[in-house]
């Protein structure tokens, strides 16, 4: 029951029934998650206070969706054959599947823990789950199974739910990185065409790619004097061939919070968004318009504005010393271990922080999908559904931002013909501030990440910055690149991303941001690691890029290994400001 009205009289639970002493109990009808009081109209998105939007998003995140909302599929729904195979006697009255989505009624069921702590009123060191857990991770029992081939194939992809704290920062940092990469692609393409026109022959040019100072391999293009170009991304590393940095999910398959939210609603609950299926009943449950544009905006904003993780350095001298020692080893700066560490060690990929030049989150308004019949319905059996590049919001944002930057009055250095990544990186830093993420639609919602204003407690605290327009260092502990993790961790097959034709190979995984990692066990993409030390050791297998680092870790003394773990244990998920438990 979503909410129960109780008197001030003492209540006692008896076998699941609430007995109200001294007064008669008043029955309250069960309500759906989406009511007129919380529904958001996208056409009026700029009329609502941000607090209202976020509070409604929290409702959609935590309150179980019901059949009245549109939860579940009909008897002839996309996963009907799978449900019938798994539950032959209960079908069609059993609405869940579990082995390929249809596994829950709310986001909260799989994002519900932010670790343990000692409550302030405890007299011992006994631990209790932290309050304010919305947006956290979950245990192995909440793993998601993605298997469109069930029952003909028993398992395919298994995913442990990650926490979603600070995702707005991640989206914005990745957007700036994508813009920087796309700028280099556009500049070298223009240079190749210009040279081909001068020489009257096809010209091939190459350039090393960098974003936020990090390497992304080499991009090449062959252009004719007529402007016909053939790109070569065979030597590009850490990012897909479209050069879009995707900061979300274990494989790096989603570039915006919204795209993943709309597909997760469909995959896990069969709550279909109009931006995906239009006004068509694609899941055949007799309901249309299950998730409106405004309601998806609210849920997206709620998730993206979760407060960022933080670092809790032990207050005692011994604990602080252990933390600092672990940090030095993690970053490869421990002087007494010169020659024994592998370069910058863990920080080679788990980069301590990335700069965000413009601390602004854009929640895009994609409009209603142009689906006019059942034949146009997208697949519901995939965790993420791709869009063609021309309909993909992030791709279009990057494209327009690059064009605006190159047209800016201060872009002379970028238009000088240099394809040097360092020159481009230096010039683009200030231009990112001058040319913010473009507005693709009047309904796009913009939120300042540093000072969002009046917002629910779960949003705070934010990352520090002197002003609401100043750059922010985002301590993700990630380079937001994909890496080969070897045969030991690789998936059994590819996983598609959010753009048509982009597939992530089985051994490739996104460098998982480690901020908050202490409170997100079990660890790794499928939850196989029961401890942080296990997670480190499981990075090693044939073909893994992490092998040299893991080998160096294995050679450390037990005390130094525990120091690295202590550093990771300081990366915490915070209890929201003004939320307390105990006295």
Model-derived segments and their meaning:
Residues 13-24:
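Bacterial N-terminal signal peptides
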Residues 1-9:
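N-terminal secretory signal peptides that target proteins for export/translocation
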Residues 29-583:
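Periplasmic c-type cytochrome electron-transfer domains
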């Amino acid at each position: 029951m979503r909410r129960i009205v109780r008197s001030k009289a003492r209540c006692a639970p008896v076998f699941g029934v609430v007995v109200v002493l001294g007064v008669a109990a008043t029955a309250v009808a069960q309500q759906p998650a989406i009511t007129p009081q919380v529904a958001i109209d996208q056409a009026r998105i700029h009329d609502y206070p941000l607090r209202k939007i976020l509070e409604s998003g929290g409702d959609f995140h935590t309150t179980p969706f019901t059949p009245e909302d549109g939860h579940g599929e009909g008897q002839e729904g996309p996963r009907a054959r799978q449900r019938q195979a798994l539950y032959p006697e209960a079908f069609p009255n059993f609405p869940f599947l579990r082995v390929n989505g249809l596994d829950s009624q709310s986001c909260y069921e799989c994002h519900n823990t932010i670790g343990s702590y000692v409550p302030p009123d405890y007299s011992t060191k006994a631990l209790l789950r932290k309050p304010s857990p919305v947006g956290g991770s979950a245990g192995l029992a909440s793993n998601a199974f993605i298997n469109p081939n069930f029952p003909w194939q028993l398992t395919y992809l298994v995913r442990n739910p990650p926490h979603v704290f600070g995702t707005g920062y991640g989206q914005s940092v990745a957007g700036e990185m994508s813009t920087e990469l796309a700028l280099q692609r556009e500049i070298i393409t223009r240079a190749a065409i210009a040279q081909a026109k001068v020489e009257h022959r096809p010209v091939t040019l190459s350039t090393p790619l960098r974003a936020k100072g990090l390497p992304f391999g080499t991009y090449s293009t062959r252009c004719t004097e007529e402007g016909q170009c053939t790109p070569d991304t065979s030597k590009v590393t850490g990012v897909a061939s479209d050069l879009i940095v995707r900061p979300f999910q274990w494989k790096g398959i989603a570039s915006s919070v919204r795209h993943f939210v709309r597909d997760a609603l469909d995959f896990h609950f069969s709550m279909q968004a109009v931006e995906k299926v239009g006004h068509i009943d694609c899941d055949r449950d007799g309901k249309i318009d299950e998730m409106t544009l405004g309601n998806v905006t609210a849920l997206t904003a709620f998730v993206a504005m979760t407060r960022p993780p933080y670092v809790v350095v032990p207050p005692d001298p011994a604990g602080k010393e252990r933390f600092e020692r672990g940090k030095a080893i993690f970053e490869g700066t421990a002087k007494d271990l010169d020659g024994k560490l592998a370069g910058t060690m863990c920080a080679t990929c788990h980069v301590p922080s990335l700069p965000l030049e413009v601390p602004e989150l854009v929640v895009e308004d994609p409009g209603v999908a142009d689906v006019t019949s059942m034949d146009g319905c997208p697949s519901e059996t995939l965790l993420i559904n791709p869009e063609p590049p021309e309909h993909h919001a992030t791709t279009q944002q990057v494209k327009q931002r690059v064009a605006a930057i190159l047209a800016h009055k201060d872009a002379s250095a970028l238009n000088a013909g240099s394809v040097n990544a360092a020159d481009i990186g230096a010039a683009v830093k200030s231009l990112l501030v001058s040319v913010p993420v473009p507005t693709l639609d009047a309904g796009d919602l913009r939120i300042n990440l540093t000072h969002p204003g009046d917002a629910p407690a779960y949003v705070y605290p934010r990352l520090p910055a002197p002003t609401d327009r100043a750059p922010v260092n985002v301590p993700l502990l990630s380079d937001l690149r994909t890496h080969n993790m070897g045969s030991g961790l690789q998936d059994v097959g590819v996983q598609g991303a959010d753009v048509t034709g982009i597939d992530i190979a089985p051994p490739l995984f996104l460098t998982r941001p480690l901020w908050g990692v202490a409170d997100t066990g079990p660890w790794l993409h499928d939850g196989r690691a029961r401890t942080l030390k296990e997670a480190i050791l499981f990075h090693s297998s044939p073909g893994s890029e992490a092998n040299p680092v893991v080998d160096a870790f294995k050679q450390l003394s037990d005390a130094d290994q525990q120091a690295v773990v202590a550093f990771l244990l300081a990366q915490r998920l915070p209890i929201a400001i003004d939320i307390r438990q105990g006295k």
